[in-house]
Amino acid sequence: MESNNNNLNLDMEKDQETTFDYSKRAQWLRAAVLGANDGLVSTASLMMGIGAVKQDVRIMLLTGFAGLVAGACSMAIGEFISVYSQYDIEVAQMKRESGGETKKEKLPSPTQAAIASALAFTLGAIVPLLAAAFVKEYKVRIGVIVAAVTLALVMFGWLGAVLGKAPVVKSLVRVLIGGWLAMAITFGFTKLVGSHGL
């Protein structure tokens, strides 16, 4: 009898594993990967842009820090509004389907998504800040930022692909090309504008 109960418990655990709702995981993964990539690329691009016209490390770091704070706040607010809108839609849908009853534990939390997005953005933004903080030579600093951002993009791209069960190589190529383009365009345009004294 006891062995039958054990078998029943094992079967129930297997059923729970096979019926696991991956939509929550996808929501968190999307917010975390987007936040980290955005923090990494936007802060690095901002620092590279300022670096194109001002070689002072202090100005570059202050600009990067301002970008970190503004970006983390923006990501948190945007994610909160987005997830709250989704939450409202899903609650209304559940009420229509079940006659007024809702199972709110299945729904994503807007506050948690906002916090996760802000933390992920901050984590990404810290990479170029730390890379630039200890290098005084301008050209070396730019090279170190690009190298650190490239390494972080590879890590974030790989992690996102593995957790999301997506093709790793395609994910890495997309992430790397996007990051490099953003930094190159920002640097180039700022250099162009700065050289004309605007």
From Swiss-Prot:
Extent of the signal sequence: none
Keywords from the UniProt entry: Ion transport, Iron, Iron transport, Membrane, Transmembrane, Transmembrane helix, Transport, Vacuole
Induction of expression: Not down-regulated under iron deficiency.
Family matches, as Pfam families: VIT1
GO process terms (BP): intracellular manganese ion homeostasis; iron ion transport
Topology, Vacuolar side: 54-60, 136-141, 196-198
Catalytic reactions on record: Fe(2+)(in) = Fe(2+)(out)
GO CC annotations on file: vacuolar membrane
Residues in compartment: Cytoplasmic: 1-32, 82-114, 163-174
Main location: membrane
Membrane topology listed for this record: Multi-pass membrane protein
Segments crossing the lipid bilayer: 33-53, 61-81, 115-135, 142-162, 175-195
Subcellular location: Vacuole membrane
GO molecular function term, any single one: manganese ion transmembrane transporter activity
The protein's role, per its UniProt record: Probable vacuolar iron transporter that may be involved in the regulation of iron distribution throughout the plant.
Family of this protein: Belongs to the CCC1 family.
Protein name per the record: Vacuolar iron transporter homolog 4
Gene source species: Arabidopsis thaliana
Lineage: Eukaryota, Viridiplantae, Streptophyta, Embryophyta, Tracheophyta
